A protein has these predicted regions:
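Short hydrophobic alpha-helices and adjacent helix-cap/hinge residues
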Residues: 2-9, 15-138
Length: 138
């Protein structure tokens, strides 16, 4: 996907999700994850959540347990994946200590938070577009 296509996808996501509830649906989360994995040069993510897996596959994202990008819901798993150099992505603020990227809801809108320290320890590089759209924390 070129930069123009990625920018169009971002506009579509933001326009689509502005009316969502505080807790993000699997479909909304999958749209953000698709942008994230595409920006990294990959098109796959590890994900054990059945509802999110179906939404990811509907977005054309391959769910593969060997991926360097991992969606985590449990801190113990996130800690292990982080130690392996994988990019941990999570949907709750309590995972901020382990996650390189958080996709959360704030005031009914999706919010992308990038933990730059955790991102540096991952063996994944995110594209400039994603880095610009996320709020960075050290």
């Amino acid at each position: 996907m070129n930069c123009k296509g990625l920018a169009l996808s971002l506009l579509t996501v933001f326009g689509t999700v502005a009316l969502q509830a505080e807790d993000l649906t699997p479909e909304v989360t999958a749209k953000f994850l698709r942008i994230l994995v595409t920006s990294s040069g990959q098109n796959k993510i590890a994900c054990g959540d059945a509802a999110l897996k179906a939404a990811l596959e509907a977005q054309g994202v391959t769910v593969d347990a060997t991926s360097a990008i991992v969606w985590c819901t449990r801190p113990v798993d996130a800690k292990n994946y982080k130690a392996q150099g994988k990019l941990v992505v999570a949907g709750t603020r309590d995972m901020a200590g382990f996650a390189g990227v958080l996709i959360t809801g704030e005031n009914g809108r999706p919010k992308l938070t990038i933990n730059t320290a955790n991102l540096r320890s991952a063996k994944v590089t995110l594209g400039d577009t994603v880095m610009k759209m996320g709020e960075k924390v050290l």
